[in-house]
């Protein structure tokens, strides 16, 4: 994985974990958990692409990997909408910057997962 992407994930997760958004802290914790899950999934797809022979083991291990891929794209879309919503309602510039960077990272990760998945198909 690109070292910039790693540091972007780590930076955004750290900053999001420091935010306190009132009664919506559970929602924020859910977003953080989904970001972490998305990062792990992206990493595993990237590793499978790097070892192209693993496509068969990936398919054997999880015969529903295409379905899982679709679910990940749904999660990304949900996160994008949630981050956009947070961006609209927050007035704190630190939070605005964090959510703008999170949104940019989500778009990048979505594109990377699409690229990896096309290579695996």
Swiss-Prot record:
InterPro entries: Flu_NS2 (IPR000968). GO terms for cellular component: host cell nucleus; virion component. Keywords: Host nucleus, Host-virus interaction, Transport, Virion. It is found in: Virion; Host nucleus. The keyword Transport applies. A motif (Nuclear export signal) lies at residues 12-21, 85-94. It holds the Pfam family Flu_NS2. It comes from the Viruses. Its main location: virion. One of its GO terms (biological process) is exit of virus from host cell nucleus through nuclear pore. Belongs to the influenza viruses NEP family. Mediates the nuclear export of encapsidated genomic RNAs (ribonucleoproteins, RNPs). Acts as an adapter between viral RNPs complexes and the nuclear export machinery of the cell. Possesses no intrinsic RNA-binding activity, but includes a C-terminal M1-binding domain. This domain is believed to allow recognition of RNPs bound to the protein M1. Interacts with protein M1. May interact with host nucleoporin RAB/HRB and exportin XPO1/CRM1. This is Nuclear export protein. It comes from Influenza A virus (strain A/Tokyo/3/1967 H2N2). The lineage of its organism: Viruses, Riboviria, Orthornavirae, Negarnaviricota, Polyploviricotina.
């Amino acid at each position: 994985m690109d070292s910039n992407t790693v540091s972007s994930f780590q930076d955004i997760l750290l900053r999001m974990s420091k935010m306190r958004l009132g009664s919506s802290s559970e929602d924020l914790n859910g977003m953080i958990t989904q970001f972490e899950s998305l990062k792990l999934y992206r990493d595993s797809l990237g590793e499978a692409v790097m070892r192209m022979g693993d496509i068969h083991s990936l398919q054997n291990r999880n015969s529903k990997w295409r379905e899982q891929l679709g679910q990940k794209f749904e999660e990304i879309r949900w996160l994008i909408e949630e981050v956009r919503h947070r961006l609209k309602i927050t007035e704190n510039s630190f939070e605005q910057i964090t959510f703008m960077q999170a949104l940019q990272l989500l778009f990048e990760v979505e594109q990377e997962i699409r690229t990896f998945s096309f290579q695996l198909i």
